[in-house]
């Protein structure tokens, strides 16, 4: 499935599933991206209008383009379950995130946006192993998880 939104925003989604008497599997992939470079009236920045004698004769709020708002995000989710048919169910859930997001400049920044980088990058893995033992009147289960996140903040002027 694909979604298209304003400011050249694109979202892609894919899901694959499989299941039989013992095995169930689901794989999902999501990718979102956007330059996110919309125009807006910057009410934090007032520009003066001068006459030839340098007297202020008016002012206005400039229309600017959002700078450093782009993003690219990818998520992959994998779920696998095995049912023994005798009351035991084993599971594996894994989720991976790869994110690259620009962080917006200050709305009063007069610098050249080509000389500026303000970005957050992230890679995260989350995994869970599980075991459930089910009987007619009771259930017991054990889950164990692991999370690893790498994150970086890049700033260059």
PLM segments and residue spans:
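Small/polar loops that bind or transfer phosphate-bearing groups
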Residues: 4, 15, 143
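Flexible loop and strand-edge segments within Gram-negative outer membrane beta-barrel domains
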Residues: 38, 67-73, 87-136, 140, ...
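Transmembrane beta-barrel wall of Gram-negative outer-membrane proteins
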Residues: 8-33, 45-100, 123-125, 129
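Transmembrane beta-strand segments of Gram-negative outer membrane beta-barrel proteins
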Residues: 1-4, 25, 29, 140
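Soluble oligomerization/assembly scaffold segments of membrane-associated complexes
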Residues: 41-42
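Structured loop/turn residues at secondary-structure junctions
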Residues: 4-5, 19, 134
